[in-house]
């Protein structure tokens, strides 16, 4: 299996081989989401695909590790990430703030990773019920792909472990506001002795990523995959790469989360300087934990790519202080991050131009 280990080669393969598959799958789920009967469930399902395409594109890159099974791997990644983004929307905009409801919704993610698990009524603790089979179809798609993987049993324990952290996080961070931090702090104490030194909000960030799951699934398509490789991937991605991923996500969303009253883990740092120090710590530790993993250079590119792609977001450019921090982080992490930063800015401009052209065409048709 040939895996790109240089930035230009990686981006060429991503644009040529991965993004078309990602958008093909997203189009399928977009059509299904538009057929949902319940108006609230439909609104959140369509919004999650429209507003969070970026998550699917990023996750899809790991399908490059699946060799000849890219189509199947992308199918899983998009279905699973779509569940994640959809449920996040439902919880973020929930009026119930009921932990039992959030726990039941996220049982779908654990079922999606458990081949043979029976489907449940994941909406049983909320008013909105009729999603026209949307969530069940997403779960079944994940199960079907995993069921076709010869080495599924080797990765299953790690998939469920990482998913367990994610689901616990989603429950605790969405409950009534005054309960969120105490619940997250208490949850952190359950695992603190097993973790490297970090704060509760950093552990929460480490729990909030799907990258480890995608990496495990992608590699497990390989005929020579082993249990030791599965363990190495888990240890390489959790906690540091996953933590860096989500801390960057929260970094660029700080202003938005403040306005909407959403929990933001980056806001718990005492100062911008402390936040910068810890982000740099996560960058270096992520690199350190990648030593000895198959295709080590590829994973280092992913690590640097996260920095470049997130920090090239328009939200960063629109905030003076954030822009200053972004430049400092890019400089500290080297030329590869700078490459991905420039590439990310260019890709976003291209997307805007495409959107403007399509909007003009639609306007002409209407006229």
Swiss-Prot record:
It catalyses: all-trans-heptaprenyl diphosphate = (R)-tetraprenyl-beta-curcumene + diphosphate. GO terms for molecular function: lyase activity. Its EC number is 4.2.3.130. Disulfide bonds: none annotated. It comes from the Bacteria. InterPro entries: YtpB-like. Belongs to the large terpene synthase family. This is Tetraprenyl-beta-curcumene synthase. The gene is ytpB.
